[in-house]
Amino acid sequence: MKFGIERLLADPTLRAPLIGKRVALLAHPASVTADLTHSLDALMALGDLNITAAFGPQHGLRGDKQDNMIESPDFTDPEHGIAVFSLYGEVRRPTGQMMISFDVILIDLQDLGCRIYTFITTLLYILEAAAEHGKEVWVLDRPNPAGRPIEGLTLLNGWESFVGAGPIPMRHGLTLGELGNWFIAHYNIDVDYRVIEMEGYAPNSAPGYGWPEDRIWINPSPNAANINMARAYAGTVMVEGATISEGRGTTRALELFGAPDIDASAVLAKMRDFAPHWLSGCILRLCWFEPTFHKHVGTLCHGIQIHAEGPGYEHVGFKPWRLQALAFKAIRLLYPDYDLWRDFPYEYELGKLAIDVINGGPALRLWVDNPAATPAELDAMTSPDETAWEQERRAFLLY
């Protein structure tokens, strides 16, 4: 299997339209070839491209910044001497001054397949700026490590944000290249756009469901440590909007959740009693952890770890969004007065609860907080969105 970057590097005919043009690269630490050469270094080494600038998304080109409004500065690359512009610093949309530094921008970002992962919003902002300034956008495509499954509520009109680029469900099942085509169609963006497709991508095939077994995983963001996290993320990311810990400050962030003042054994038992069919496709294991930073720092937490890997993993049956919704529901049923929802500025959104920003509306939170609400009622809200998206996205599937 070859990723888009590898096809571009190997085939001079693919690169031919870039010759004589000023080329920029939007990348992060996971922008590497199969032998772990960073894409910027590999493109520079070709000798036939004029690389004039680089861009970094949230967490930075170097991937050194943590979550939620921890910004990266612009800098000059010390090896190649080109400007590196931050798209998560003073601005999140590229400025006109940034746009005049190139003719074509190559986007080589490893996504996680989740609406809230901000790289897809950065893609949208680049497409819109490129349309305004007459620039070309090429996506060097990479696998969606969460695969093709769809899950979650569609973002409501008026709830767009940096973690909500458009009316898509939480788990969208598209690659970045495919999403670019959807953005262009949905928002009617007049831009010169091209996808350098992968070769041999098989998102519905076991065991990796699009992620090759022999491919080394590199964190695209500091807490995206492995495929298990990528699969669980569409659910565990919701814990960012709660007072319980998502495991930041541990080595398994966004693969587990817990708090010092809950009985995780009781929570798991309640989950199994309330909606056991939402727990399929993975193994849930009770655990203890003590965050070294972030929520509940230095405090022993009782929690649950999600194992969406190994013999217990079932790709189609795994429902991370419903699983995490169920965990919230179990906590609310066991502890009716628990201060569950975290009220703080979240990804530059003020005046809205983070859990609502994450879900693109209040429906999930209202379901959790309603003691009479049933699993069937959440399914009744969510399933039509999932079915509609499955039909809508068909026209944009490249693989």
What are these model-derived regions, one by one?
Residues 111-123:
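Glycine/threonine-rich flexible loop motifs
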Residues 50-59, 140:
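Short internal beta-strands
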Residues 258-379:
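Conserved functional hotspot residues or short segments at active or partner-binding sites
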Residues 201-297:
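Glycine-rich, aromatic-lined ligand/substrate-binding cores of catalytic
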Residues 67-102, 114:
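Glycine-rich oxoanion-binding loops at beta->alpha junctions
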Residues 159-234:
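Conserved anion/nucleotide-ligand pocket segment
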Residues 63-67, 138-160:
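Glycine-rich, charge-decorated loop segments at or immediately adjacent to ligand/cofactor-binding or catalytic sites
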Residues 1-49:
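N-terminal phosphate-binding or glycine-rich loops at protein starts, especially the Walker A/P-loop
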